């Protein structure tokens, strides 16, 4: 396994000018305010009675969502968190504000769907909603249709998994390639993806289709290596998977291990900043 992380802003970092502009715009906003990696925000949260709704969510994770975050603590996010699909896979700590019913720690959830309501900012799976309760109060909490909550983005942790790539069923090899990223750690967004044949320095960029899905119509022949630009701190960083990620004859529907994991934390702009762990 070979992993290297480098600052992305150099003369040869991004060959495509439009992508470079996109990265700069995405990374410039946090510089305009005090940096914080634990911005606490307020909203309301409801819950789905069936978690199947979230595993079949608009992020497109399918059955893989059942393996995220312990397999059940999932959420659908409103527009501010969903961000047109860019927010797919992000992790949040959510707690309700009724201290009689709810614990201080709350529940940690991962976004797998878009909330189809404007009444709440989050719709949790029923296990996640119940997990916000104090001991013995879960039944009372779930009797409520929705509750006031506060939440903050937190790093996703997949201790026993690397960042993985699933080749979408729509891919038509060897040139038409669509992939989705699974088990993305850290507290970042992937803002650019390049692929190249292993051993080659001729990188080609992929285009974001939606959320964790990226595609290209002119994929180089395999085996393929990858490099990503992720937000981290106030900057962007290259994450290199300079090994065989996709084999020469990759197959649609298969999941491949990149051999790397993301641990960076991107800064947000907010005040005050919550630096305390919710316990």
Swiss-Prot record:
Name all Expansin-like EG45 domain ranges.
56-161
Q: What induces it?
A: Down-regulated by gibberellin (GA3).
Keywords from the UniProt entry: Glycoprotein, Secreted, Signal
Q: Which domain of life is it from?
A: Eukaryota
GO terms (BP aspect): plant-type cell wall loosening
Signal sequence region: 1-35
* Domain (Expansin-like CBD): residue spans on this chain: 175-258
Tell me one Pfam family matched here.
Expansin_C
Q: Where in the cell is it found?
A: Secreted
Q: Which residues are glycosylated?
A: 118
Sorted alphabetically, the Gene Ontology cellular component annotations on this record are: extracellular region
Q: Which family does it belong to?
A: Belongs to the expansin family. Expansin-like A subfamily.
Q: What is this protein called?
A: Expansin-like A1
Could you tell me which species this protein originates from? Oryza sativa subsp. japonica
């Amino acid at each position: 396994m070979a992993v290297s992380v480098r600052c992305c802003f150099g003369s040869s970092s991004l060959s495509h000018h439009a992508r470079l502009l996109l990265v700069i715009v995405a990374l410039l906003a946090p510089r305009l305010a005090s940096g914080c990696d634990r911005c606490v925000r307020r909203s309301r949260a409801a819950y789905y009675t069936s978690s199947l709704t979230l595993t079949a969510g608009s992020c497109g994770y399918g059955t893989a969502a059942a393996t995220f975050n312990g397999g059940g603590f999932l959420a659908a996010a409103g527009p501010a968190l969903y961000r047109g699909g860019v927010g797919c896979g992000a992790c949040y700590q959510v707690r309700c504000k009724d201290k009689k019913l709810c614990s201080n720690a709350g529940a940690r959830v991962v976004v797998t769907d878009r909330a189809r309501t404007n009444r709440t900012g989050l719709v949790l799976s029923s296990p996640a909603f119940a997990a916000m309760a104090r001991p013995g109060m879960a039944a009372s909490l779930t009797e409520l249709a929705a509750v006031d909550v506060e939440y903050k983005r937190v790093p996703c942790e997949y201790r026993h998994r690397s960042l993985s790539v699933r080749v979408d069923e729509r891919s038509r090899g060897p040139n038409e390639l669509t992939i989705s990223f699974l088990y993305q750690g850290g507290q970042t967004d992937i803002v650019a993806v390049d692929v190249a044949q292993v051993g080659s320095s001729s990188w080609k960029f992929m285009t974001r289709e939606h959320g964790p899905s990226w595609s290209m119509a002119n994929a180089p022949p395999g085996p393929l290596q990858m490099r990503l630009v992720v937000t981290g701190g106030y900057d962007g960083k290259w994450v290199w998977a300079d090994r065989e990620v996709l084999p020469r004859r990759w197959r649609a529907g298969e999941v491949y291990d990149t051999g790397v994991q993301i641990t960076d934390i991107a800064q947000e702009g907010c005040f005050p900043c919550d630096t305390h762990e919710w316990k």
